[in-house]
Design a protein with these regions (language model features):
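A generic structural signal for short hydrophobic patches within well-formed alpha-helices
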Residues: 64-65, 356
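Cytochrome P450 catalytic domain signature, combining two hallmark sequence patches
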Residues: 34, 66-85, 363
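Central I-helix of cytochrome P450 enzymes
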Residues: 152, 156, 206-216, 237-292, ...
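Cytochrome P450 I-helix active-site segment
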Residues: 11-21, 122, 126, 175-176, ...
């Protein structure tokens, strides 16, 4: 008698506990990083857990990150994972269209981030930052994250939507943008169309946003004005089949770029300030560098901003310790294997920059604030292309990274010229709710 061995591949270890059906949904909403770090400490670079009826496979570490980011789209899909963005960006935009159509749309977006546009943005950013900080008076107390959220909305709208929109920007736009952001939460990830108050506000805000942008488009066409901004580029853009973009499509692409450039910038700017003030020994070098590059000049060139290498290292260390994107997900469309484990299709794959960046295999003394880890002689972020992933990685890396870094550099340069800063409290922790 002969027998054939059955090759049964092991599945990732499971984080036990959680509530029936909900699993770890509530804990993930309250403090996702604590939950994911607990699983990593228990199981290492791969484990799974239940999340609202779905099986989530969590991957962490540079090698696991590489497997996540290099997986083909027909295996790990962004489209199915990010359907919660459809009510905000709109039907037929980004994650609600075919890969070919999305590539065309990204082709419309990329010119807004080219070098000649970034040079113009440097001037817009400085003008907005100076005007904003002048409203602070000579002394006082500010909510830094709220201030950075407001300022980066002003900057992003001026750079990306245009002068007319920024000149007429009122508290209405801030409210609309806030209502759109309020539609992004854990529940929206699974059920983005439930009749909830936050989702109703989100939907009303988008309708009003289309109205505002449509009015600007109508005025430009009626008056024969042609701006030199991203809005104008979208107004004249055509798909490969010759189809022009509808006003709803234009609004959706503007919102896509606005979200990419604003949220990440606000978080990065606020935490850069906090971490530097918590570690003031790095401030003299940054201020000396700014004086050497710009002196008393009121204008900031793109080339000059690139010379602020000490400041850039501090921003990069902020990206590492307080990444603007704390979790990234994909829908698993085909079975995949990693490190001897087999993961079945149908669930979700997840990585977390906030967890991965704190691993000693990725960074030396990972919990220590140390911007010098990014000097050329150390270059800890270059151990692997997937060691520093605060803006994602691979072909789907966040397109707003260069915009965010430039914006933070300008904000910091203006801020340090006008104010001496100190923290009201020394200890600050992220609020994930």
């Amino acid at each position: 008698m002969t027998t054939n061995a059955i090759n049964v591949k092991k599945t990732p270890p499971v984080l036990s506990g959680g509530l029936p059906y909900l699993g770890y949904a509530l804990e993930l909403q309250r403090n996702p990083i604590a939950l994911l770090q607990r699983g990593q400490e228990q199981f290492g670079e791969i484990f799974s857990f239940l999340l609202a009826g779905s099986n989530v496979t969590f991957l962490t570490g540079s090698k696991a990150n590489e497997a996540f980011f290099r997986a083909p789209d027909d295996q790990f899909s962004q489209k199915e994972a990010y359907q919660f963005t459809v009510p905000i960006f709109g039907k037929g935009i980004a994650y609600d269209t075919t890969p070919d159509r999305m590539s065309e749309q990204l082709g419309f977006v990329f010119p807004a981030l080219r070098e000649e546009r970034m040079q113009a943005y440097a001037g817009f950013m400085a003008t907005e930052a100076k005007a904003y900080f002048e409203t602070w008076g000579e002394y006082g107390v500010v909510d830094l994250l709220a201030a950075m959220n407001e300022l980066t909305v002003f900057i992003a709208s001026r750079c990306l939507i245009g002068r007319e929109f920024r000149q007429h920007l009122t508290t209405e736009f801030s409210r609309l943008y806030h209502d759109l952001e309020g539609g992004i939460n854990l529940l929206a990830f699974f059920q983005p169309y439930l009749p909830l108050p936050s989702f109703r506000r989100r939907d009303k805000a988008r309708v009003r946003m289309v109205e505002l942008i449509s009015q600007i488009i109508a005025n430009r066409r009626a008056e024969g004005n042609e701006g030199e901004d991203f809005l104008q580029a979208l107004m004249t853009a055509r798909y490969a089949d010759g189809t022009a973009l509808s006003e709803d499509n234009i609004t959706g692409l503007l919102l896509t770029l606005l979200f990419a450039g604003q949220h990440t910038s606000a978080v990065l700017a606020a935490w850069t300030v906090i971490l530097l003030l918590q570690h003031p020994q790095y401030l003299p070098g940054i201020m000396a560098e700014q004086q050497a590059v710009f002196g008393p000049r009121e204008t900031f060139s793109l080339e000059g901003l690139r010379q602020l290498v000490a400041l850039e290292r501090s921003i990069k260390e902020t990206e590492r310790l307080r990444p603007p994107l704390i979790m990234l997900m994909r829908k698993i469309l085909r079975d995949f294997e990693y490190n001897g484990y087999q993961v079945r299709a149908g669930g979700l794959a997840m990585v977390s920059p906030a967890v991965s960046h704190r691993l000693p295999d990725c960074f030396h003394f990972p919990n220590r604030y140390d911007p010098d880890r990014f000097t050329p002689d150390r270059a800890e972020d270059r151990k692997s292309p997937y060691t520093l992933i605060g803006f994602g990685g691979g072909r789907h890396r966040c397109i707003g990274q260069a915009f965010a870094y430039q914006q933070v550099k300008v904000i910091w340069t203006v801020l340090l010229r006008q104010f001496e800063l100190e923290l009201v409290h020394q200890n600050y922790e992220p609020d994930y709710i």
